[in-house]
From Swiss-Prot:
<dbReference type="InterPro" id="IPR018130">
    <property type="entry name" value="Ribosomal_uS2_CS"/>
</dbReference>
<keyword id="KW-0689">Ribosomal protein</keyword>
<comment type="similarity">
    <text>Belongs to the universal ribosomal protein uS2 family.</text>
</comment>
<keyword id="KW-0687">Ribonucleoprotein</keyword>
<dbReference type="Pfam" id="PF00318">
    <property type="entry name" value="Ribosomal_S2"/>
</dbReference>
<dbReference type="GO" id="GO:0006412">
    <property type="term" value="P:translation"/>
</dbReference>
<dbReference type="InterPro" id="IPR005706">
    <property type="entry name" value="Ribosomal_uS2_bac/mit/plastid"/>
</dbReference>
<dbReference type="GO" id="GO:0022627">
    <property type="term" value="C:cytosolic small ribosomal subunit"/>
</dbReference>
<protein>
    <recommendedName>
        <fullName>Small ribosomal subunit protein uS2</fullName>
    </recommendedName>
</protein>
<dbReference type="InterPro" id="IPR001865">
    <property type="entry name" value="Ribosomal_uS2"/>
</dbReference>
<dbReference type="GO" id="GO:0003735">
    <property type="term" value="F:structural constituent of ribosome"/>
</dbReference>
<dbReference type="InterPro" id="IPR023591">
    <property type="entry name" value="Ribosomal_uS2_flav_dom_sf"/>
</dbReference>
Length: 247
């Protein structure tokens, strides 16, 4: 059974690329045609790449590997969090802090600080042992740390793979993963350079439905790898979005 159907890809608008004038020539082999100034992605090639990515991601999970989901743009934030949590993996959906992979020891200290502040707050110590001003400053610090690090709070080491929604926006995590030899799975729209992507998935990275569908397929691969569940259905739902890309 295919991990996703052509019908699902069409309904989610996976085939709508960016304006032709914004294209990256390196994406030419994945483009089917141009329609009304918009590049149309070849879904037959997308389907093949999705299946390749699914199988590799399934193997990583089966071997006990950990995956980091990355998507900080508005259209991706919800799907990234939902699907990472569903598959028991980690995520960054607010802001990528430089060095999250290449300087993970420092990031880990920030996570420890976050947990320390959480403990002080939960036990009421912030209110009993500190002034109101100090407590307010600590809570402000905790809020900022939680926003950026809550999705990786239990990540003990750099992940075995990362999954990225927008390669252009998430240029830094892609480069950090590449430097460390961590495989990169990513949705690649018609305006990106796919060279640093280990397992590229040609797809519309602007439409919410497209992002949710592809991200759910990746999560399904992890779930199957972890639990041996077969025939996992990709999650897609009707969302009122523009057919074309935002730019």
């Amino acid at each position: 059974m295919s991990v996703v159907s052509m019908k699902q890809l069409l309904e989610a608008g996976v085939h709508f690329g960016h304006q032709a004038k914004r294209w990256n020539p390196k994406m030419a082999k994945y483009i089917f045609t141009e329609r009304n100034g918009i590049h149309v992605i070849d879904l037959h090639k997308s389907l093949k790449k999705i299946e390749e990515a699914y199988e590799e991601m399934r193997k990583i999970a089966e071997d006990g590997g950990k995956v980091l989901f990355v998507g900080t743009k508005k259209q991706a934030q919800e799907a990234i969090k939902e699907q990472a949590e569903r598959s028991g993996m980690y995520y960054v959906n607010s802001r990528w802090l430089g060095g999250m992979l290449t300087n993970f020891s420092t990031i880990k200290k920030r996570i420890e600080r976050m947990k320390e502040l959480e403990k002080l707050d939960a036990e009421g110590i912030l209110d009993t042992d500190y002034t109101k001003k100090e407590a307010a400053e600590f809570r402000k610090e905790l809020s900022k740390l939680s926003k950026n690090l809550s999705g990786i709070r239990d990540m003990e080491k750099v992940p075995d793979a990362i999954y990225v929604v927008d390669v252009k926006m998430e240029e830094l995590p892609v480069k950090e993963a590449h430097l460390l030899g961590i495989p990169v799975f990513a949705m690649i729209d018609t305006n990106v350079d796919p060279d640093l992507i280990t397992y590229p998935i040609p797809a519309n990275d602007d439409a919410i439905r497209s992002v949710k569908l592809i991200t759910s397929v990746i999560a399904n691969a992890i779930v199957e790898g972890n639990q041996g569940i077969e025939n996992v259905e990709p999650q897609s739902e009707e969302v009122n979005v523009e057919e074309g890309s935002a730019e």
